[in-house]
Regions:
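A generic structural motif
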Residues: 20-24, 68-70
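C-terminal binding/interaction regions
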Residues: 29
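N-terminal amphipathic/basic-hydrophobic helices that include classical n-h-c signal peptides
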Residues: 1-8
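C-terminal structural segments of small proteins and small subunits
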Residues: 66-101
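Short glycine-/aliphatic-rich beta-strand segments at the starts of folded cytosolic domains
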Residues: 12-22
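A short linear hydrophobic-aromatic micro-motif
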Residues: 46-52, 92-95
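Short, charge-patterned binding micro-sites
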Residues: 11-12, 49-70, 99
């Protein structure tokens, strides 16, 4: 938790590892990952990145970060990112890690 003059800043991160069963090449995987990251960035205004498994055509580790003045709002935004991924993409979420920075 970081204190800034005039208010409180909360930074929360969500790191998920996904398995993309329908991917048969790095090109397939990157298409799916790029779509997930772009949609979450545009829809929920979060910072996003692919963090690991860059050269694996089936797995990817994705990171999402939001900055706000409300812990509940940060959790809500990250939950929406996770729900979007689970409901609109043919991927299996292998692990989920949340962190307050």
């Amino acid at each position: 938790m970081v204190m800034i003059v005039g208010g409180l800043v909360i930074v929360k991160a969500l790191v998920i590892e996904i398995y993309i069963s329908e991917s048969f090449s790095l090109k397939d995987k990157r298409r799916v990952v790029k779509s997930i990251l772009a949609r979450c960035r545009q829809k929920f205004n979060v910072a996003v990145a692919e963090l690991d498994h860059l050269n694996d055509n089936k797995k990817s580790t994705l990171g999402f970060v939001t900055i706000t003045n409300s812990s509940a709002y940060a959790d809500e935004v990250l939950d929406k990112c996770l729900f979007l991924i689970k409901s609109e993409y043919s991927v299996e979420v292998i692990s989920i890690n949340r962190e307050r920075i």
